[in-house]
């Protein structure tokens, strides 16, 4: 049964465990406290979910175009979960990274797997600084696939909790797709460096550069040329998840 609703994803308890890059997400050994959770927005597909997508976003409120894109993903059969990464009082406007990011992602991962989604059928997707977050998740968690759109912080970390993407690209554990345009925060020479760095990882990677700014599914264009770019970027997102979340 399809639908859109809000829910909570319990955080795992902070118990000593291996949190290195080789750790695979698993269900928490003990039940989290009731006040330790991540607020999430869920969009369900019609019928059986073929996999789950954690959509990381930098907005405290969803735009109409972002919700429309989430519904399009659900229309392809994906169970879409979007966490509120700013639920902590300490959350920075620059984004959520480091242990807090991984904790929130793990909560969403557990929420999905508890509803029958296989671990290798969970993907991550993010735009802008949330695209940076999706990339960093893919270097720390062996999920099914990851996609970053216009992700900054390529050669210099965005915050003290983040790492420069080129510095950790060789540690990618999930097939990764990067979509970039002419944003000032993602210079083409840096994007080329990221492409080369990601190629050294043991998983598939693909970087696509668009000539304009309107290549993102969360910022639809107003004319036919913009629409053509938008359709191309959406198709690449759908195809990447189709190919790797099986």
Model-derived segments and their meaning:
Residues 1-246:
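N-terminal cap/leader regions of alpha/beta-hydrolase-fold enzymes
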């Amino acid at each position: 049964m399809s639908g859109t609703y809000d829910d909570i994803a319990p955080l795992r308890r902070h118990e000593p465990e291996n949190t290195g890059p080789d750790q695979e997400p698993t269900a928490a050994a003990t039940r989290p406290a009731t006040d330790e959770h991540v607020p999430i927005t869920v969009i369900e597909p019609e019928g059986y979910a073929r996999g789950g997508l954690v959509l990381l976003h930098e907005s405290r409120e969803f735009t109409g175009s972002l919700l429309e894109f989430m519904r399009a993903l659900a229309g392809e059969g994906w169970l879409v979960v979007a966490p509120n990464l700013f639920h902590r009082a300490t959350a920075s406007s620059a984004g959520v990274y480091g242990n807090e990011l991984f904790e929130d992602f793990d909560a969403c991962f557990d929420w999905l797997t508890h509803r029958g989604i296989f671990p290798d059928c969970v993907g991550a997707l993010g735009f802008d600084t949330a695209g940076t977050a999706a990339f960093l998740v893919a270097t720390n968690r062996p999920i099914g696939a990851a996609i970053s759109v216009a992700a900054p912080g390529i050669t210099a970390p965005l915050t003290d909790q983040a790492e420069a993407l080129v510095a950790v690209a060789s540690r990618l554990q999930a097939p990764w797709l990067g979509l970039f345009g002419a944003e000032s925060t993602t210079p083409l020479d840096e994007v080329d460096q990221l492409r080369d760095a990601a190629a050294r990882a043991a998983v598939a990677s693909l970087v696509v550069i668009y000539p304009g700014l309107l290549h993102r599914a969360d910022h639809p264009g107003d004319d036919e040329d913009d629409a053509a770019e938008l359709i191309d970027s959406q198709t690449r997102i759908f195809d990447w998840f189709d190919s790797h979340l099986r």
